[in-house]
């Protein structure tokens, strides 16, 4: 009887590790949230180059999408802990100057936004804008920025 329990327990442990292997852990210095992993990259890139970097890092990766105030707080703490420099950070939202809609690069819904008050129209002469998390707000609020500006960036990936 004891041997049966020992073998059953061993098989259960093996099954647990095999069934949870995909998507259950993030690499070192990545933030695990909602079954995805997030990482700040300090290399300064334009918004398009940052999105391409994320996509090339691993298939299915994109610039990060934030969907709640709780997300904003978690990311603000993570960025503050791991960002080596100072400055704004690209996220995966973009939009057109004409029109009221924005889109996430991963195709998820845009029901939550955290625009700072008195948005700076750095993209005024451009058709498109890209969203950045603003450093002087403690990385909690966003700004619309010219997509050609170079910033650090936050990628999201499934592992």
Swiss-Prot record:
A motif (Sugar-binding) lies at residues 119-121. Glycans are attached at residue 118. Expressed by the venom gland. Residues 33-156 form the C-type lectin domain. Residues 1-23 form the signal peptide. PROSITE patterns: C_TYPE_LECTIN_2. GO terms for cellular component: extracellular region. Homodimer; disulfide-linked. This is C-type lectin 1. It comes from Bitis gabonica (Gaboon adder).
